C-alpha cells in the first residue's frame, strides 16, 4: 500500500526518456543540471548500482549519499538527516532502503532504473510534489526495461509523457534476460561474470 502522505500521482509531472543503457549517465548529468532541481532522490534497483551512481554524482561536485541495505542503520539515519537538512542535494536509493523516507521539499524523483515491481514506481514518485509544491518524476528507460514501463502504465492507467528518445522495437531475448538478471538485489559476482562471458561469446559468433 502507498504511504499515507504520498502525493496522488495525478499531481506529479511524469516523463520518460528512452535511452540505451550506456546513455543513462550522460542523461542523468543533464537532469541534475536543472536549476529547478533543489532536492532529489535517484532510484536504482541494486545496491551496487546505487554506489556507482552516487560516485558519479559526487564527481560532478554535487553532494550526495547512497542509501541501501548494506549501510548500517546509523549510516542511513545520518544520510537521511543530511538530506533533510539540505547538507546533501541528492540521495541515491534502492526501493527497500527508501521505505519510510518522509522528507518535504523533494522536487525531483529520477528513476535511473525502472522498478520491476510496478507498485514500487508509485511508492517512489509519491515522495515529491507534497503540500501543493511542484514535483517531477523522470524515468530513464533502456530497451530491457520497456516491459517494466508497460506494466507501470497499466497500473497507473495512464501513458507517461515521452520527453526524449523512442522506444526500441528490438526488445531482444538478451535484453529481457538482462532485465531479469537485475531483479535480484545483489547478483552474485560469479553469475554476473558468466553472464558477461556468455554475451561476449555470442557477440563474437555474430560478428
What is the role of each PLM region?
Residues 85, 153-207:
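Basic Arg/Gly/Lys-rich low-complexity intrinsically disordered segments
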Residues 1-171:
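Conserved helicase RecA-like core
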Amino acid at each position: 500500500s502507498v504511504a499515507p502522505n504520498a502525493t496522488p500521482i495525478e499531481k506529479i509531472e511524469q516523463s520518460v526518456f528512452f535511452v540505451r543503457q550506456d546513455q543513462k549517465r550522460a542523461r542523468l548529468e543533464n537532469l541534475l543540471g536543472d536549476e529547478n532541481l533543489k532536492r532529489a532522490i535517484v532510484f536504482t534497483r541494486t545496491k551496487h548500482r546505487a554506489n556507482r551512481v552516487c560516485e558519479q554524482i559526487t564527481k560532478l561536485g554535487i553532494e550526495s549519499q547512497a542509501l541501501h541495505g548494506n549501510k548500517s542503520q546509523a549510516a542511513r539515519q545520518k544520510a537521511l538527516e543530511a538530506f533533510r537538512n539540505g547538507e546533501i542535494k541528492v540521495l541515491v536509493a534502492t526501493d527497500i532502503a527508501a521505505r519510510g523516507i518522509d522528507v518535504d521539499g523533494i522536487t525531483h524523483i529520477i528513476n535511473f532504473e525502472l522498478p520491476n515491481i510496478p507498485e514500487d514506481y508509485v511508492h517512489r514518485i509519491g515522495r515529491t510534489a507534497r503540500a501543493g509544491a511542484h514535483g517531477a518524476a523522470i524515468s530513464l528507460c533502456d530497451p530491457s526495461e520497456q516491459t517494466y514501463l508497460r506494466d507501470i502504465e497499466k497500473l497507473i492507467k495512464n501513458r507517461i509523457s515521452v520527453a526524449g528518445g523512442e522506444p526500441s522495437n528490438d526488445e531482444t531475448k538478451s535484453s529481457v534476460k538482462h532485465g531479469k538478471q537485475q531483479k535480484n538485489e545483489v547478483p552474485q559476482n560469479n553469475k554476473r561474470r558468466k553472464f558477461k562471458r556468455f554475451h561476449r561469446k555470442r557477440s563474437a559468433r555474430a560478428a
